[in-house]
């Protein structure tokens, strides 16, 4: 004959596992809420560090690259040589790819 488990031991194991599950769930919720609170404080700390840092060298580089983009490096003759606007033909009429 096979030995049947007692109903009390089965209920004891179920209650023990459920208590363990609830404990783990509460501890997980507490650690994630603590991390979120510490993340908010660390953002304030990062703002303080950023306020003490001098960003002007980076801003000067940004202005210089914008000026280089705005100034034309090619003359009109060279530009006309590469992109010959006089000989450019644009097709007109219906698009042959659309039926």
Curated annotation (Swiss-Prot):
Query: Which Gene Ontology MF annotations are present?
Result: receptor serine/threonine kinase binding
The positions flagged as glycosylation sites are 94
Entry's Gene Ontology cellular component terms: apoplast
Task: Tell me where the signal peptide lies.
Answer: 1-31
Lineage, top-rank taxon, reads: Eukaryota
The cross-references to InterPro entries, in alphabetical order and at most eight, read: CLE9-13
What biological processes does GO assign it? cell-cell signaling involved in cell fate commitment; maintenance of root meristem identity; phloem development; regulation of cell differentiation
Which cysteines are disulphide-bonded?
Answer: none
- Hydroxyproline is found on 91, 94
Which key words tag this protein in UniProt? Developmental protein, Differentiation, Glycoprotein, Hydroxylation, Secreted, Signal
Q: Which PANTHER family match?
A: CLAVATA3/ESR (CLE)-RELATED PROTEIN 10, CLAVATA3_ESR (CLE)-RELATED PROTEIN 11-RELATED
By sequence similarity, the record places it as follows: Belongs to the CLV3/ESR signal peptide family.
Protein name stated in the entry: CLAVATA3/ESR (CLE)-related protein 11
The UniProt gene name for this protein comes to CLE11
